[in-house]
Amino acid sequence: MKLGFISDIHIDRSKTLQETDFLHTLSAYINDQALDEVFIGGDISNHYEKTIAFVEKLQAQSGAKIYFIPGNHDYWEAKSAKKHTLTIHDTFKSHPQSMLNKALIVGNDTAVVGHTGWYNHAYHDPAFTKEKLETGRHKLVT
């Protein structure tokens, strides 16, 4: 079994490349290398719905099994949106391609375990109160 790992592709940050460019390039590479499974280690995009759509399209286009572990950017959404980060986290946890808090046995002696490894240092900010913790919002990052 051939595995691939990549991270921080930020498909929506380029001034010249579109999402389709990333899909085409990654699919071609996956096929050229005959990869069976690919793990994307976060920061796919700056919006959770775009991240999910991208991994679904990449799996369909490449034919390989695509898994992802969301990074801090993947948890974002439009500033005007009111969805709580915990709701986005639950969306990721329930997605079949997400490795969030899951383990996958690969071959006979390897396991891949998904964890964001991300910690919000704003929790140590004195302005971060128990009330803000309960609302799930602090400076648009929790």
Show which residues each predicted segment covers.
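Short amphipathic alpha-helices and their capping/turn segments at secondary-structure boundaries
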Residues: L26-N31, V55-K57, H95-N108
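Proline-centered loop/turn at the N-terminus of a beta-strand
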Residues: E37, K65-Y67, Q97-S98, A111
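Active-site-proximal loop/helix segment associated with metal-binding centers of metalloenzymes
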Residues: V113-T142
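Beta-strand-turn-beta hairpins that frame and shape the catalytic cleft
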Residues: M1-G4, A103-G114, T135
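Short catalytic/ligand-binding loop motif for oxyanion handling, primarily in non-cytosolic enzymes
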Residues: H47, W76-A78, G107, V112, ...
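N-terminal active-site segment of His-dependent metallophosphoesterases
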Residues: M1-K65, Y75-K83
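Glycine/small-residue-rich loop that forms an oxyanion/phosphate-binding "nest" at active or ligand-binding sites
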Residues: A78-N101
